Amino acid sequence: MRITHLAASNWRNFKNVEFDVGERLFVVGPNAAGKSNLLDVFRFLADIAGPGGGLASAVDRRGGLKKVRSLFSRNNAKGRLAVDVTLQDGDDSWRYRLSVKGEGKGPNRPVVDEELVVKNGEELLKRPDDRDRNDEILLTQTHLEQIASNQSFRSIADYFDQVQSRPPDHPRPLARRHRRRRPLRERFHRPDERDRAPTS
């Protein structure tokens, strides 16, 4: 399985972004152009689907909905943060769409505005459904993160969970940060005859 197309709205510094994903993808641009933010879309889905993760955790570890949602969101897509991915698994084509909004009351938790799963043109999941409307707290969790609810599309959850990348809030490896640096003289000094040990 692999992602073949991605579209997102109100994601970090992007009002709207959409592109195909080939066998190999290069993301280039100047500093602060949003390259890391773009790649974080994939980590975001992994954090939702992974063990001990979930929607609330994925949003919280990025500083909350205000930090994740674009500054353009007030006048774009009703302020919803949306991620829409198309995936290919052999002969099977999948689509997963997640739209998130603020609860609008109390702690303003992130809640599911829309969750959609389509396989080969057949709609397997569309939320909110009747259960969600009768118990709105269910919308604080995606079905992607729930083993009891994602049986029909667990292969997507397993795929997202395999995304391997250093999380945005994870420090650089200690080996890189604290590796021993040689004294300046050792790094730039070329030994001459006086530095060499005498030979017999």
Predicted segments with their positions:
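The conserved Walker
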Residues: N31
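Phosphate-binding P-loop
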Residues: N16-G22
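Conserved lysine of the Walker
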Residues: K35
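Hydrophobic anchor at the beta1->P-loop junction of P-loop NTPases
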Residues: V27
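Electropositive, glycine-dotted interaction segments
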Residues: G90-S200
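Hydrophobic residues positioned within well-ordered beta-strands of beta-sheet architectures
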Residues: T4, V17, L81-V85, Y96, ...
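Conserved P-loop NTP-binding catalytic core
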Residues: D40-K105
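N-terminal pre-Walker A segment at the start of P-loop NTPase domains
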Residues: M1-K15
